[in-house]
């Protein structure tokens, strides 16, 4: 699955444990992961952690990121404030696939309290390996840029 060499992972306090599992999973797949999230479960402000990933992607230091919070909603709002970011809150394989194929998403957002842990790695794999289809989808993306 070596679609991306670098994946950025960030989280707030609610996503710390899931982020740790995700990083281990990605590293086992020989992906380089930069962790710019919290390192414990003490309360932090999610916009600060979303901004870290957004800034790194905008600077082109990494092509793709993963953000994790309790539901993912706040992270989605915070990350999508930039026109260069297409952050997608995904709950299953279909949303992960469409996020990439139709929307060229560059940040996957997961809700630690809402995601089915049995399929979280499948969702990540689908997100990382699906290619943007372009065509009519590109026309639509240009309208919201």
Swiss-Prot record:
Q: Catalytic residues per the record?
A: 102
The domain of life for this entry's organism is Bacteria
Please give one Gene Ontology molecular function term for this protein. Answer: intramolecular oxidoreductase activity, interconverting aldoses and ketoses
InterPro entries from the entry? RpiB, RpiB_LacA_LacB, RpiB_LacA_LacB_sf
Residues involved in substrate binding: 13, 136
> Could you provide one GO biological process annotation from this protein's UniProt record?
carbohydrate metabolic process
**Family in the record:** Belongs to the LacAB/RpiB family.
Isomerase: present as a keyword of the record?
Answer: yes
Q: Which UniProt keywords apply?
A: Isomerase
NCBIfam families with a match to the protein in the record: PRK05571.1, rpiB, rpiB_lacA_lacB
SUPFAM superfamilies (UniProt xref): Ribose/Galactose isomerase RpiB/AlsB
What's the protein name?
Putative sugar phosphate isomerase RF_0486
Q: What is its EC number?
A: 5.3.1.-
